[in-house]
Amino acid sequence: MRKILKFIAVALLLLVLIGGVTLYIMSRPDVARFSTAELSGRVPVMASQKTETFPTINVPEVTGWPAGQSPRAAQGLSVQRFADGLDHPRTMFVLPNGDVLVAEAQSPPRDSSGIEGKVMSRLMSKAGAGGVSANRISLLRDADGDGKAEVKTAYITGLSSPYGMALVGDTLYVANTDALLAFPYVAGETKMSGKPTKVVDLPAKGTNRHWTKSLVAAPNGWLYIGVGADSNIGEKGMNREFRRASVLEVRPENKYMRTFAAGIRNPVGLAYYPGSDRLWTVVNERDMLGSDLVPDYLTDVTEGDFYGWPWYYWGGFVDPRVEPEAEDRRQYVKRPEYGLGAHTAPLGMTFTQGLDLGERWSNGALVALHGSWNREPAAGYSV
């Protein structure tokens, strides 16, 4: 009997040791083998895949900018504080009179139960993204042109995780996480006097993992909205991804909406090349294929484009985690124009034509890189 009990004890100990070693191996962070520069450009390195059971987690502590300090600017440029005291400013929109609108928002309330929910809640809190959303758009005004806003007012309140803004004629459009709203715009107002009209509902069901809704107006007045996927690679079922991982087209005059381009995991920033009808976007690609995959990117978007998500990435590389493979779609996958490095998380973009930044910066695009949470070493955190 003792021999049997001893055998069972040894067997259990071995199982625990094997399980512990396996868990350790599976959860070890994947250290990048290539630099962000090598993973960027028109022909970035396509590293070998490392399918992760647990993501590499590397979330920097948020400290903010101390008084008197600012980001380091490139030679010939300078940075100064325009306004402060904002609550998670997400996007900005400059009105024709020079006033600056700022969307202040966080993720809408989410279910934080279960292991996944608790882990995500902890990560967001560490990154400074916890708490209740301000759900407002503030107006900043620099009347004397000294580069500092003297006026800061709550322009629109009571929104639902607002993100994108666009002005067409005398109508200001605001993209909430769940709907596109239209407000009557009156130049010079410091508080919106008009009431909103809902134009269309936007995808926001499920976990609403990528909740931001970027927005840009085309030269003809139509609107384009970037909607991120509700998952990493469609693991919760593609029925939850209807009109997600897409750029949507909205025609406000008759409240018509359709999918303009698809297979784009999270098209956060949208902008038109100045003087043209050519639409561009910056995209956050998928996770858990290692620290070197997949490069986020900058690319143009035309009607009917398909960028491969979730089955493919970067023009046709297969993601083996997605089943069944959609081989019939592979021939239609468009390759992005420019890689921005893996996990750099590009959020905002603007073209520099017409800006007073000097000749060196007069013909290009500025892209704000939020920075990684799942890469070792960290990447991004720059413009």
Regions found by a protein language model. Name each.
Residues I25-A73, D111-S112, A127, V132, ...:
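Beta-propeller domain segments
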Residues F82-G85, T153-L159, V199-T207, T259-G263, ...:
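Surface loop/turn motifs at the tips and blade-to-blade linkers of beta-strand repeat domains
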Residues L95-G98, L167-G169, A217-N220, Y273-S276, ...:
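Residue-level detector of Asp-centered blade-edge/turn motifs that repeat once per structural unit
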Residues L101-A103, V174-A175, Y224-G226, W280-V283, ...:
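Residue position within the beta-strands of beta-propeller blades
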Residues L140-G145, F183-K191, V301-Y307:
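Short loop/turn segments immediately following beta-strands, especially the blade-tip
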Residues K148-T171, N176-A218, A229-N232:
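Asp-box/WD-like beta-propeller blade repeats and closely related beta-sheet repeat scaffolds
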